[in-house]
């Protein structure tokens, strides 16, 4: 696990400037650093830099940038690479590349050898989490590559025929000549969904490379494509269905065991996050089965009972016989992390579960350098409550159309009768846009986000959703979450929270073979109308008694309404003061000031009320924190 950055430019970016960009990511790689500049063609210079967190082959042989040896009829030093992540099948690939003169036991060198032999299509053979920058001197091309599901981040800035890239926004912001011009349309969408999805970023001309994406840069020309696309892979795998549940369970179990085993290969201490839920408990159980010693497990508990799951995690740990560590966190302990959010989430990010994720990462880092997580189980095996609601909404869609039609009749239109309907009925009656139906969000949220940022041109449609060509709302939303929410929110949250403490998080459920196999399963194996994550739960019950796992999920939550109207109130009032907003020149000062004042007086309606406005206010607050850290101080 590391951080990478670099450039391809005709400008005069010095080696000192490149090192400064690299050092903004010290937390991502405290063990080693490297920075080099190469002379390219047509007046271009190529700069590569990396911060290293040593996981495999802790020797100096793993230093980056790394260069190719003479092999396959190609001269040495013709290919250079910087790389963030892990290639879990590097051992298998190394055997296929046995005629390459390897000098290390690093997966980075396997990437170089694979590229020399197979070209850029070598990425199709790689199973892992990665962000790669590769420079081929023969063709004077630079390639940027991101893993299939977006576990590792990769930003890039294109301007004036030049390219600058980095694992985070910080190295781009540190690059000479960078302009911090905020995109208003992206800001409005952030307020609505609480994260910023690829390919967008908060800044103009800066983008995230999409999951499963490749960018080729050659003397100012850019070409992008996807080597792994959710929709295409889903339909391809659907052509090879597995019809028998027991057969599917056995094959999936085998794939999960192999995925966990490959993620336990490390030259540093390794453990597992454990919440006591299905996914983390199953990953921990398989890891324990695969380990000669008790696996180190970590969980945090909260003093407020409605948020606390530590007792469940402890029960599972005792049953499995792990080496368990837990820590109880009071509200003060969580609140103290709020100020550090913009430093490590260097783009506006408002999923408040980032705070407990940082806390459990800090706890784990005291004893290990690598931690397994259960991320991906909800998206690939139908675990979210939202999916239940979508199944209900699709059944009610005809009734929703009828209600919508009735409320539009002369004499009723404009009477605001929708506001008297239950929020679930409003969601299906008001939202008639076929490209927005799976979002199940009250239109009031959308209107509020648009009102916060005037003339933002906010459009909350996802262009890829119609391309799935799937009629079932539940399946379509699962695919959309894999494409957007999983990489943009969940994996971003885990990456930044773990990297804050130089901890590597690994997600076995997001193994390439597991993801692709999940697409071969009939949807009834995941959701049968009553039970979600059906097949994954069945595997978990092979390891852990059902009564330990079957309970309502609490999740990593924090008391936002209490914080915003309590200890954060003074800062929130400052950020929403009409004069301040007028000087800032981003938001509608009158509207936002009135909205926040009303919120502070009346509070939050709560989930399912249609007026759960603490989410938007928290997103506004975190943006202002970020703005103070990166824009106002500049």
Give, region by region, the residue ranges found by the protein language model.
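Generic hydrophobic alpha-helical membrane-span motif
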Residues: 35, 153-156, 282-285, 380, ...
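Short hydrophobic/aromatic residue motifs in ordered secondary structure
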Residues: 32, 153, 280, 377, ...
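Short low-complexity, flexible loop/linker segments enriched in glycine and/or proline
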Residues: 339-343, 365, 387-389, 563-565
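Adenosyl-5′-phosphate
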Residues: 1-4, 78, 121, 174, ...
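Short, basic, helix/turn surface patches
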Residues: 133, 348-360, 399-406, 580-582
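A generic secondary-structure signal for well-formed alpha-helical elements
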Residues: 25, 176, 263, 291, ...
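Cysteine-centered catalytic environments shared across enzyme families
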Residues: 1-345, 357, 361, 542, ...
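Active-site adenylate/phosphate-handling loop in enzymes that bind or generate adenylated species
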Residues: 148, 359-418, 468, 485, ...
């Amino acid at each position: 696990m590391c951080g990478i950055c670099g450039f391809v430019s005709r400008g005069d970016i010095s080696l000192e400037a490149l090192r400064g960009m690299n050092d903004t990511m010290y937390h991502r790689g405290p063990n080693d650093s490297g920075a080099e500049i190469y002379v390219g063609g047509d007046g271009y210079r190529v700069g590569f830099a990396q911060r290293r967190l040593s996981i495999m082959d802790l020797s100096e042989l793993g230093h980056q940038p790394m260069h190719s040896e003479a092999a396959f009829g190609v001269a040495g030093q013709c290919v250079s690479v910087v790389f963030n992540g892990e290639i879990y099948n590097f051992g298998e690939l190394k055997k296929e590349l046995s005629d390459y003169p390897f000098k290390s036991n690093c997966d980075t060198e396997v990437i170089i050898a694979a590229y020399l032999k197979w070209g850029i299509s070598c990425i199709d053979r790689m199973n892992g989490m990665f962000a790669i920058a590769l420079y081929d001197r023969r063709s004077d091309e630079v390639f940027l590559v991101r893993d299939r599901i977006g576990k590792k981040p990769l930003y890039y800035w294109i301007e004036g025929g030049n390219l600058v890239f980095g694992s985070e926004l910080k190295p781009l912001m540190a690059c000479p000549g960078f302009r911090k011009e905020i995109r208003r349309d992206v800001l409005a969408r952030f307020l609505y969904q609480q994260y910023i999805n690829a390919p967008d970023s908060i800044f103009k001309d800066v983008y995230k490379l999409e999951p499963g994406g490749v960018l080729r840069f050659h003397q100012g020309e850019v070409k992008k494509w996807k080597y792994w696309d959710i929709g295409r892979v889903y339909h391809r795998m659907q052509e090879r269905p597995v019809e028998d549940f027991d057969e599917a369970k056995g094959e999936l179990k085998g794939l999960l065991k192999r995925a966990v085993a490959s993620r336990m290969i490390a030259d540093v201490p390794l453990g597992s996050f454990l919440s006591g839920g299905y996914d983390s408990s199953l990953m921990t159980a398989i890891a324990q089965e695969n380990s000669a010693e008790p696996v180190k497990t970590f969980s945090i508990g909260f003093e407020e009972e409605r948020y606390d799951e530590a007792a469940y995690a402890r029960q599972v740990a005792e049953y499995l016989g792990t080496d368990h560590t837990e820590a109880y966190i009071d509200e003060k302990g969580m609140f103290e992390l709020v100020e550090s959010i913009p430093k490590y989430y260097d783009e506006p990010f408002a999923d408040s579960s980032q705070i407990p994720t940082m806390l459990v990462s800090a706890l784990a880092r005291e004893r290990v350098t690598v931690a397994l997580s259960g991320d991906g189980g909800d998206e690939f095996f139908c675990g979210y409550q939202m999916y239940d609601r979508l199944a209900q909404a699709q059944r009610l869609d005809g009734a929703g159309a009828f209600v919508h039609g009735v409320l539009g009749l002369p004499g009723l239109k404009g009477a605001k009768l929708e506001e008297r309907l239950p929020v679930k009925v409003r969601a299906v009656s008001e939202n008639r846009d076929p490209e927005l139906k799976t979002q199940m969000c009250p239109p009031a949220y959308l209107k509020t986000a648009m009102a916060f940022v005037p003339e933002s041109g906010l459009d909350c449609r996802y262009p890829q959703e119609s391309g799935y060509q799937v009629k079932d709302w539940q399946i379509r939303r699962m695919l959309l979450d894999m494409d957007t929410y999983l990489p943009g929110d969940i994996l971003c949250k885990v990456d930044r929270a773990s990297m804050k403490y130089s901890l590597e998080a690994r997600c076995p459920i997001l193994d390439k073979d597991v993801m692709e196999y999940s697409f071969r399963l009939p949807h009834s194996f995941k959701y049968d109308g009553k039970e979600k994550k059906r097949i994954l739960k069945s595997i978990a019950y092979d390891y852990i008694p059902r009564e330990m796992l079957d309970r309502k999920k609490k999740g990593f939550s924090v008391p936002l309404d209490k914080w915003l109207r309590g200890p954060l109130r003074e800062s929130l009032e400052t950020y929403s003061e009409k004069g301040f907003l007028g000087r800032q020149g981003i938001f509608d000062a009158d509207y936002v000031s009135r909205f926040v004042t009303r919120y502070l007086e009346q509070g939050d309606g709560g989930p399912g009320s249609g007026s759960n406005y603490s989410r938007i206010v928290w997103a506004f607050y975190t943006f202002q924190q970020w703005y103070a850290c990166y824009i106002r101080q500049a």
